[in-house]
Every structure is written in structure tokens, then in C-alpha cells.
Amino acid sequence: MNPQIRNMVEQMEPDIFVYYFNNRPILSGRNTVWLCYEVKTKDPSGPPLDANIFQGKLYPEAKDHPEMKFLHWFRKWRQLHRDQEYEVTWYVSWSPCTRCANSVATFLAEDPKVTLTIFVARLYYFWKPDYQQALRILCQERGGPHATMKIMNYNEFQHCWNEFVDGQGKPFKPRKNLPKHYTLLHATLGELLRHVMDPGTFTSNFNNKPWVSGQRETYLCYKVERSHNDTWVLLNQHRGFLRNQAPDRHGFPKGRHAELCFLDLIPFWKLDDQQYRVTCFTSWSPCFSCAQKMAKFISNNKHVSLCIFAARIYDDQGRCQEGLRTLHRDGAKIAVMNYSEFEYCWDTFVDRQGRPFQPWDGLDEHSQALSGRLRAI
């Protein structure tokens, strides 16, 4: 450790960690930023060569932020280890501000032998366009070095507790809403960084063969439009995709369907009273419970219209059909995806690398057959 660097501590107190690493998306009063770091060689199985903590205030000059303190320390440390390749991991209570994000991007461009993964507890000023652009420059691949940014989940919080907190042997106890807040922040970061889906994931999960089996995940792609002068205007800041959360004793014990994760996300957008149209493209139509909750949402939000295009119809031989009828009766438009919707999703939500959408055998026939089933419902 370098004793000349100020504001470095060996471990933080448990109450400090619990207070500052709270992952509630909107919080006030957390004006100190904590950054826990680990430096490793490219051998991920080895122990960290260096691990410690920086802290700094949000509002003084950027040089006082913990990200800048880390860069100052690391550049000095790096002079003694010039030829090695290193993997650096940060666990940060707030994501970097605009100036810090730009400085980190410059640092990575100057030292391509360093890779950086940033786990953040919360997103800082994520609604500001200049901040969004700075994070995209930092994280998006453009033929050169870039950072990987992720939202802290249970495993990362537990790791920080074990490695950076003076817990006196006590286990980490997550907050009740940690998994829900993680889902919201994960989706928001995906919107901000414009995450895209792997092509294989799309073709596997959105294949519309009626007899497909083994697809236990539901993917939901979405876009939002606002009415302006009798025209629907696409809101690029609210466009992305979600999938259902699998059962997890540290997350959602019973799992959480993609539709419910999406309903959790919408209030986070803070839409005003203008007219909005939300369009979902789902790999499966909603189950009964999700359909009921979506129907309740549009009944309580008359300024939001809902369109659902499903690749396949989910039917558990139970009340799914009743749920779809309720959703339709309460004003939602429900349809089966055809070629144009599949192509739109491919062009918009998939990392297609410039490749055009290639329909699979029977796409049109399956779409027509499923449309007939939906009309009968």
C-alpha cells in the first residue's frame, strides 16, 4: 500500500457500508463516494496484488473524487510494473461523474494492458444527457479499450462485505428490496448504455415454432413513444430489453416474470401526463397473473396505451386465456409477432454486426397459425 495517498483506509465500518452502499435508486444525503478496488494479473484465480479503499466527496473538484485518486495512485504503482497486464475491479457506491468517466476513458486508451470492470451500487445523475454520453464513451466498444460497467447484485455486496468491511465475522444481511432495486438499475443501465442482445439468444428465445420446448426464460423488448402533434415520437432513452428473474434465495425466492420487472421499471421513468404508447415484444405472451397486473396498470394510467406483440402464446392449460381477455378488454392491443416485428427487434435490440434478419423456416406459417389461436381466445 502507498502510505502517501490520503483517504485510504484498510476497512470500513459496517454501518458506513450499509449506509453508503444502499442500492435504492434514488437517495439523498450520500455525498461521500466510496471506491473499493482490487488489482489482479490476468490470472483470475490468483489473489489480488493490491486491494484497498478510496473515498471522496461528490461536490469538491473532480481531483478529490475517489476515481481520480485511484488513477493518481495506480499510475505511480504502474511505473514499477510496466510490462504486466492487469485486471482492475472497482466496487463503487456511486457511478462516476462526467469528468471522472472521461478521465478513466482517457486512462484506458493510454494503457491498453489494463482492463477495468466497474460494479456500481447506484447510478449518479443517470437522467442527464451529458452524463449518459460520458458513460457510453467509457463503456462502449469502439475498436479500443473500454470499461465494463455492471450493477452490484447480492454476490458483489457480499464480496465487499467480506473483503472491505470490518464485519467482526458477522454475515452480510441484504436489504429486503435489494433484488428489486438491482433489476431497476440493471434495466436503466441497459437503456443508458444501449445494451443489445446476443443474436443466438434472440433466435433461440423468439423462435415462433408453436411446439418449442425447454424455453423457460421470457424476454421482453420494449420501446416508448410520446404523442406530439398527432404523431408518435420515439423516446430513445426508454428502449431496451428485460428477461425474467430466476428463483434465487438471495434475489426473488419465487423468481419474477419479465412483465412484472417491466411494470416495476415504468414508474422509474416518471412519465408526465402527456399521452404515451408503450410497445412490448415478448418471447411468450403473459401468464394469467402478469396479464391481470398489466391490465390494472393501464386501467390506472389512462395516458399510457399498451401494445403487446408475442412470439408465442403461453398456455398452461389454466387461466392464461382469461388473463389475455382481461388485458384486451381493459384496452391493451395484443397481437402475434410477424416478419416485420421480428425484423424490427433484430435491427433494434440485437447485436447483429450489420447482418440482416434471416427468417427461420416456417416463420410466416407459424405466425398465421398463432394469430388464429389468439383470435379464438
From Swiss-Prot:
Pfam families for the chain: NAD2 (PF18782)
GO MF terms here are: cytidine deaminase activity; RNA binding; zinc ion binding
- Subcellular location, principal: cytoplasm
UniProt GO cellular component terms = cytoplasm; nucleus; P-body; ribonucleoprotein complex
**Segments for region (Interaction with DNA):** 213-215, 312-319
Positions of the region Necessary for homooligomerization?
209-335
Enzyme nomenclature, EC number: 3.5.4.38
Which CDD domains does the UniProt entry name for this protein? cytidine_deaminase (cd01283)
Q: Boundaries of each CMP/dCMP-type deaminase domain copy?
A: 29-138, 214-327
What chemistry does it catalyse, as a reaction equation?
a 2'-deoxycytidine in single-stranded DNA + H2O + H(+) = a 2'-deoxyuridine in single-stranded DNA + NH4(+)
Q: List the active site.
A: E259
Which residues are involved in binding Zn(2+) 1? Answer: H65, C97, C100
Gene Ontology biological process = cytidine deamination; cytidine to uridine editing; defense response to virus; DNA cytosine deamination; innate immune response; negative regulation of single stranded viral RNA replication via double stranded DNA intermediate; negative regulation of viral genome replication; transposable element silencing
Q: Which residues bind Zn(2+) 2?
A: H257, C287, C290
Q: Which residues does the annotated region (Essential for cytoplasmic localization) include? A: 1-60
Q: What does this protein do?
A: DNA deaminase (cytidine deaminase) which acts as an inhibitor of retrovirus replication and retrotransposon mobility via deaminase-dependent and -independent mechanisms. Exhibits antiviral activity against vif-deficient: HIV-1 and simian immunodeficiency viruses (SIVs) and also simian foamy virus (SFV). After the penetration of retroviral nucleocapsids into target cells of infection and the initiation of reverse transcription, it can induce the conversion of cytosine to uracil in the minus-sense single-strand viral DNA, leading to G-to-A hypermutations in the subsequent plus-strand viral DNA.
UniProt similarity note: Belongs to the cytidine and deoxycytidylate deaminase family.
| Protein name per its UniProtKB record | DNA dC->dU-editing enzyme APOBEC-3G
